[in-house]
Amino acid sequence: MIINKFSLKWMLAIAVAIPAIALLFVAFTSLNTMSVMQAQSNSLYANTAAPMRAMAEATSRIPRMRVGIDMMLLQETALKDAKGVLKRVEEARTEDIPEMRQAMQVAVDSQVNPELKEQARKLQARFEQMVREELEPMLQAFANNDMTTAQNIYRDKYAPTYGEMRKQANQILDTLLQQAEQQNHASVESFEAGRTKQMVIIAAGLIISFITSLVIITNLRSRVAYLKDRMSSAAANLSLRTRLELDGNDELCDIGKSFNAFIDKVHHSIEEVAENSKELATMASSVSQRAHMTQSNCASQRDRTVQVATAIHELGATVSEIASNAAMAADVAKQATLHSGEGKKVVGEVQNRIQTLVNELDNATQVVSSLATQINGISSTLDTIRSISEQTNLLALNAAIEAARAGEQGRGFAVVADEVRTLASRSAASTEEIQQVINRLQTESTRAVEAMEKGRSQSDVVVEFSAKANQSLTEINSQIDQINDQNIQVATATEEQSTVVEDINRNVEDINQLTTETSHVADELSRASASLQRLSSQLDKLVGSFEL
């Protein structure tokens, strides 16, 4: 519709302008009618009031003059008055005739209509003729007391002329009255025409205004109903595919365009949220796998730690046995001369035991080194977990921002994003705690390795001394003092080894405890990843409720 090309402001302006224009036309018509009526009224006044008053004055003097003449005629009868004939003749000449002339001249001058002016002039000329031919002779006869002549003139000339002049004057008055009636009728017709024109303009303005307003209101109602239905449908179905298609340039089209832009942005945001949710689910699954792997590695490490502890306990028993044997060797040294052969066997046994100790120390060193390697692996895994936690936190922050943009519809998604961010923060904190434990575990592992190396060095020394003892058995009788010194050294070394073994045992127990804690952390991480997967699933459901 062409009306849709106008804005609401212009529609309302048109709806108001039409009756306003109609009112202007009514006002213009009223002013025009009033102007015409005023002109007609002025014309009626100019053509009627003064001319009729002057003509009426002149007409009224005609019978008054006759009354004066009649009174002259009655002076010969019983009806005579005190003035007498001569007095009345004088009054007629000095007053009645001049006043009649003046009235006739005023009547002629006051006429506006040329035809009436001409008739008034004829009446004036007839009066002058009557004065010359009838009144003057008749007045002269009255003055000469010639009543017979006066009566004859009165009867034969003046009376017919009087009737003729009365008739002419009445005709002029009738014409003036007809003219006034015509002008009044024209004024009434102008009034009726103006009123009819005003009624037509008012009716046309009202009809056009009603039709225009009806068209505007119907169009607005249909367009508003379309907006309401489409928006209600989109809100009820959570459809992000809904678009408002309105033609025109009014504000409703602007609302439709703004709504479409809003839906496009929300659609894009929900699609990004869906992609991020899938990526979050993948990361949660990866974190869960890493957590299970960490838990498995912790279990394996715990088993190996138990093995190391067992070996350390055996090493401690061996060291104790070496110490006991060293004490026995001190006693037996006194009898070395008699038991040199037996001493060789003892020395050989000592060598075997020491070699076993060396092997056990090597195994312990390998186990501890493997433990350090596993710890480094755990540290790398924790770095991965920390990176995942940071990415999860970042994704949760982005999700919260997008939820805030979504407004009321993204409130549930904002709660989910906040829960994900909280879990990511807890995972990061747990990762930092695990990192601290691993750092302590690495330190203790390093110390354990150093202690193992010292023990191995001492074992090498013992092996060397045992070899020398085996070689010196032939000289054992002469070197008993030296053997006693060596036994003392062996006792001292075994005591140191016992101390080192106890330290290693404690370190292994600490490692075992740390491994247990790491396993618990891995369990929590696994549960956190499961919760993250559950939240991701809920997020997918929320996203799935939208029609993309």
From Swiss-Prot:
Function: Chemotactic-signal transducers respond to changes in the concentration of attractants and repellents in the environment, transduce a signal from the outside to the inside of the cell, and facilitate sensory adaptation through the variation of the level of methylation.
Membrane topology: Multi-pass membrane protein
Any single Gene Ontology cellular-component annotation: plasma membrane
Location(s) in or outside the cell: Cell inner membrane
Source taxonomy: Bacteria, Pseudomonadati, Pseudomonadota, Gammaproteobacteria, Vibrionales
Domain HAMP: 218-271
Name of the molecule in the record: Methyl-accepting chemotaxis protein HlyB
Alphabetical list of InterPro entries matching this protein: Chemotax_Me-accpt_rcpt, HAMP_dom, HlyB_4HB_MCP, MCPsignal_dom, T_SNARE_dom
